[in-house]
């Protein structure tokens, strides 16, 4: 038995960089084949001449046979592995890689997929892919193959090289637009002129090398909008740029870029959340980094510890043309940050640039990888060779325990390995699988030892201070084991958990590939009636000095109380791309934790499980870096939550790149809230935030609270007497604040959902309504506009007719009711605002119209204006406010950017100022210059100017209704 070796990658790029050939003799080539022997797996497909009519010397076209092998996995287990042995495999057409299928190469050398010179069909056009990550295989041949999407998990290519020869200038090696937990791993991309290595990006690219081509990576937003990681990789001799990107939320760690014009180019008029650290730029002839959209908070650039050699222009802002250039041949970018900055939580943020760049006399050695490499596969022991069954029925507990007692590295081929008690690893034990969807260690429901009340009992446990690797498996605690914690991790900082799925909830499959039902019919409870969410301990519990590297982990199990709980550890810990979703109370908790670095933490709340879930709770902790953190609420949410991050008794927390978002109107009230000081951070896009020691907040808000206790109020309007009206969507209610009597009045409760309000000239209350069974921003529902007398709503409700604009005499149009916010329009906002509107609703007065835009029901507020006037419209998704003219037919024309701020409402005041509801109330003058802000205790949604003398600003703000007197 060979001892398992932990080999850290010292100077891994030196293997391709002759100028830095200082590699120690005992360092393993990270770009060699990582699986040098065949790994037996009865449920996998082997792409060999024995099983398919192929050759492995590049002499024949194997395209159809390779597609057949992939299809066979889909037809048998649905999600699984195709093993490809060493050799050269020539293809001539696109290969569809179905959802959840992995291609894994093995042999002394990696197998090579070859597109030969001048292969027909790859000379021009788009979509000329060698490999296309796609969704599920269509059931009928007549159905179109769908691109991978936000539901495409666990597809991958590993330990396989791709070579595109000359004369295929339209070829793209991989179309990679999938969701989390897919990968391109341990690959070489040898490209020719015109080629792109990877088009659109997914979760992770690791240990990949890109040679030649126009671009190594050319990408937009990932399919689900999550972050992406490029780690321990190399780029050389791309003709245009190594990476062209927009909104990929890109983490670039320990990469080497050499002999290219540009390292990262952010597309024009687009933003990027970009983190680069511990990397090297060498011989870069044009600006190494090109930043666009520099004045927008979505642009978040954070760069740390980059060594530059022969790179005269480090960075250029595309809009202004400003460059950061240096004369020194060698220099280190110790820190660079651009975007919305909070020096601390007590100061007002601003968009700014900071940099700390120092010249060097000599380039330091490349930063070693902290990802442990696996031991040679000939030292792995196949658990099935020891008698394990892996069918999900037989009890494999004793066989696993004996294997751990006698062997170091235990390989689990595809299978579900049922156990009945904790599996406890020795200090050097490694558990290796190759596909966590089909390779699981699992409990059945009601496993005896996990019942009742008692201390958390792990399914898998690592020893304190151990050096362990757990990789490529799923950990499944089922739904009725209340003492269960899937993994209790106490191993030390040289350990690793990688490519692990904490099974349960979304994306859970049996061994036949059949999906386990997630929900009941109306998404209010589990699909298995006897299972209840939030009835187990945490999925991953890192404690008692536990640390190490945690990479590409998915924890969406709704039965667990949290996906991640890190407690009582000061050991070094690193998280790379961890997705924690769909819990009821908490997604991730850090308590008494120090010295961790977290890159690409993904947090998501589902409407069924998590409308009241706290995504990230940090207590009693310090010295933690969070790079490119994203907290998201799904489009089906119908209620807000107070904060995405809660801190308590913690300091020296460094957030670099922080986003919170939802496609609906129900945002987080605060991005971050500190419980000790009471300070909340409202902006949703932050480049730089330090949470340090905070004093208690003593300032008083600028507004007076009139009423509270609502769920979420918005849609405000004013009647002719200056009384404000507003809605509480969840409870389907319309309220009025009586200005003279200073009291709240309930106007009505509707059988449909009121969205927004307005009045016509005769005092009729106009209500945009929506009826929908399953709430989602992507489900338009049945949108109607009704009118009523607010003094007698039950007896006067009537539906307004939708009529063509062409049927209206433009001379009769006096008032135009418009959306003061459009919360889903993100790009090309000007075009969307000026898009033709063919129909409208005519109010009972005959002179007030409501243009029927396609997103009429997706607004926080309606406002009234007149033909010939200028209006202001905020875009929540774009976080901008635009000015728009109304023509003589009541249509919207000439949109233009007003300010780089906007969210839920925009109100034009009589004096020309514009009040914009965006975290607080921001007051801009008519030239777009910020004058001041109005501090509101809750996040404002809708604002109107009312009162008897039209001098009171009324503010709908989540659960409270506020006002403030507007001075002359």
Tell what function each PLM region has.
Residues 81-88, 92-94, 102-104, 409-422, ...:
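Conserved metal-binding segment of the jelly-roll/cupin
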Residues 51-62, 218-220, 383-396, 552-554, ...:
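Glycine-rich phosphate-binding "P-loop"
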Residues 693-968:
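Sequence-structural signature of mature extracellular/luminal beta-sheet repeat domains
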Residues 592-607:
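Active/binding-pocket-proximal capping segment
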Residues 2-6, 15-83, 91, 96-98, ...:
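Extracellular "leader-to-stem" segments immediately downstream of a signal peptide or signal-anchor
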Residues 573, 617-628:
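Long, structured stretches of catalytic cores involved in phosphate-ester chemistry, encompassing
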Residues 270-290, 294, 299-303, 625-628, ...:
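Ankyrin-repeat and related helical/solenoid repeat scaffolds used for protein-protein interactions
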Residues 411, 566, 574-589, 644:
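C-terminal, well-structured subdomains that either form a transmembrane helix-short loop-helix hairpin
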